[in-house]
Structure formats: structure tokens, C-alpha cells
């Protein structure tokens, strides 16, 4: 399928008459940082300490959910236990400690190039993440100075994490944008599902073990192998999107 056909297909299934891209809603873990391997390791450690059997692959598939949602679901299915909000908060604090003990996750190769290309095209960059870890969020300003707007949505801001579209709908509200004004950059099926449900043109990047086909199945309009490939393609993509005005 050509790029023009992909855009036409997006317009068809959303019912949009055109596009006017002025914002990019961008995930954090697995997009800006190569951090998912640390997260999955910390999650497995937390669960095993509490007698819950699991694998790292399970947590790659749950990426995008809030920490509280993951804890409540895993304790319910793995231990038959209903976890309160306070208990989930305390357990998430333990998981965060395990995550920190693994060291700082590196910046994802190509992430700065993608953000700079968007900035050069005057496309607002809005962070949309299910993360509730303040330590990781604090790194954004240090690692990507001047590359993000003040508008952002984290796991602290939503009641329902991805795949519910709430994070992206809230981000659009904060940035005063409509779905046909936004592209989304995501690496996980649940995030792609959420972006698709929100009506945004959705770009997947396969920065982890999840294959391209799973991102397309979740609703991605385009999928790139990594952030460097996306950075190289962005100028052409943004021009193509700009030619389909509402």
C-alpha cells in the first residue's frame, strides 16, 4: 500500500474529510527511552516476590496500562486477590524501586531526531504516557530540552489507561487539538489501540520484541522498524499528510 493509499484508508475509516497535522502525541517508554527491558524485569521481580507466576513477555503486552491497573489485574488473575488503591500504590512504589536499581534507561536511538524533525515542521510535541514514575518523567527536560510542550498526560492524569482512548483524548483536550490534527507515535499494541480509538493517524515503531504485524492488527496506519527509520521518513510523511487538507 502506498503512503497516499494509507492516508486515504485513514480518512475512510475515520470519516475525516482531511488532515491538518499540528501536533504529535508521543509515548515515553519504548519510544523516547529504551526502558521496557528494565520495566519488564522489575515487574517480574515484584510479582515473583508476591508468589505470582509470570513472564516478561506478558508485561510487554500490557505496556500502556497504568501501574495500578497492571497490579490489580495480575494480583486478581495470579493470586485471586482484590487489591485496593492504597495497596496498588504501595506495590507500585516497590516496583519503582526495583526499576531504579537497574540504572538509567538509555535514550532511544533516533528519538531526538524525531522530535527535532517535528519541531522543525512546527508540529507540537505532546507527551502521552501511562508511566507514573516521576523519576523517568523528570528526565524528559534533561534529555530533550526544549523539545516538548508543557501539555502532557501521564498515568497520574487518567482513570483508565491504554487501550482506553482516554490518555489521547485528554492530551488533545490539553493541546486544544482535534483527532485529524494529530499523529501518534507508539510502540505497543495497547497504545496503538488507544490512539486508533481516539481517531488519530497512528504510527507504530517496533523498538521491542512485539512484531510489526501486531501493531498493524492493533490499528497502526504505518509501522517503522525503529525511531531512526521514522526520523528519516518524517519529512516526506508530513508533506504527504499536509496535502490532504480538510
Language-model regions: role of each:
Residues 2-60:
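Active-site neighborhood of HAD-like aspartate-dependent phosphohydrolases
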Residues 32, 107, 125, 184-185, ...:
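Conserved SAM-binding loop
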Residues 31, 129-131:
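Conserved phosphate-coupling serine/threonine residues in phosphotransfer and NTP-handling enzymes
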Residues 46-47, 66-83, 139, 172:
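Helix-loop "lid/cap" segments that line or gate small-molecule binding pockets
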Residues 1-22, 116-119, 132-246:
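Asp-based, Mg2+/Mn2+-dependent phosphohydrolase catalytic module
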Residues 52-61, 79-91, 146-149:
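Short, surface-exposed acidic
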Residues 40, 44, 67-72, 92, ...:
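An amphipathic alpha-helix signature
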Residues 9, 75-113:
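Metal-dependent phosphoesterase signature
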Amino acid at each position: 500500500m502506498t503512503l497516499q493509499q494509507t492516508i486515504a484508508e485513514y480518512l475512510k475509516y475515520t470519516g475525516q474529510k482531511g488532515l491538518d497535522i499540528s501536533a504529535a502525541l508521543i509515548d515515553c517508554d519504548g519510544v523516547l527511552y529504551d526502558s521496557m527491558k528494565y520495566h519488564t524485569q522489575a515487574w517480574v521481580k515484584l510479582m515473583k516476590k508476591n508468589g505470582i507466576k509470570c513472564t516478561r513477555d506478558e508485561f510487554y503486552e500490557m505496556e500502556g496500562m497504568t501501574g495500578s491497573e497492571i497490579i490489580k489485574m495480575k494480583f486478581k488473575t495470579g493470586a485471586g486477590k482484590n487489591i485496593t488503591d492504597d495497596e496498588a500504590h504501595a506495590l507500585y512504589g516497590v516496583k519503582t524501586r526495583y526499576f531504579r536499581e537497574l540504572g538509567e534507561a538509555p535514550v532511544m536511538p533516533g528519538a531526538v531526531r524525531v522530535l527535532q524533525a517535528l519541531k522543525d515542521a512546527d508540529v507540537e510535541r505532546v507527551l502521552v504516557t501511562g508511566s507514573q514514575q516521576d523519576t523517568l518523567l523528570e528526565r524528559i527536560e534533561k534529555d530533550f530540552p526544549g523539545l516538548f510542550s508543557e501539555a502532557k498526560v501521564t498515568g497520574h492524569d487518567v482513570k483508565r489507561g491504554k487501550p482506553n482512548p482516554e490518555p489521547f483524548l485528554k492530551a488533545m483536550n490539553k493541546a486544544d487539538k482535534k483527532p485529524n490534527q494529530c499523529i501518534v507515535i507508539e510502540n505497543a499494541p495497547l497504545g496503538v489501540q488507544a490512539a486508533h480509538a481516539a481517531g488519530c493517524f497512528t504510527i507504530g515503531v517496533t523498538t521491542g520484541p512485539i512484531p510489526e504485524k501486531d501493531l498493524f492488527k492493533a490499528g497502526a496506519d504505518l509501522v517503522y522498524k525503529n525511531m531512526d527509520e521514522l526520523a528519516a521518513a518524517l519529512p516526506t510523511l508530513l508533506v504527504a499528510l499536509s496535502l490532504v487538507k480538510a
